[in-house]
Amino acid sequence: MTLYCSFALERETFLAETNLKAPEIWVGKIFLAGHTVDHKKDTSEILRLIQTLVEDTVAKDYSKLSDQVSPKEGLLLDLKGIWTREEIKKELSKKGNYFETYFFDRELLKKQKNSENVRTVRDLFLLSGGIEIEFYYESMTECELKFRFKENTEWEKELINPYFKKVQGKWYLHRMF
């Protein structure tokens, strides 16, 4: 029991640090549904976007998030619906906002869920040991990602698969993890 408490305390201390590096991210399997277009450029662009999102999550900084969202399509957030760039900026300006609660701050999430047994998206990334990204191209303009953790694989299911759409030749985040 003492060993478990000691490990849990060490993990809590580690996750509370603010100068942590984002986990390594690499391309895994790539699936093409109904088309055979060369996806290398698209895969590189989406990988760069997801690396930035993971780095920003670990850094607790979504100040650039709205720039990664299509002005036309918006961002699908769980049960919150689709948010415009302006709504994202407005939400980020609030203390204790949705992103702080679910993505960054375990204490806020504990209060929200009324439970001690919670993990933020940031926690999941930091405890992943590295992330392999599977790409599921549903068309030439839509791609869903699946995260595969190197460690703590049972926690992968706590994330929603991010979804990207290509609008006017540029890839944008359409659904968060």
Task: Tell where the protein language model's regions lie, with residue ranges.
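Bacterial Sec-dependent N-terminal signal peptides
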Residues: 1-11
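Short beta-strand and adjacent turn/loop elements
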Residues: 69-73, 93, 160
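Exposed beta-sheet edge and beta->alpha loop/turn motif
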Residues: 105-177
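Short, low-complexity N-terminal intrinsically disordered segments enriched in polar/charged residues
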Residues: 11-59, 67, 75
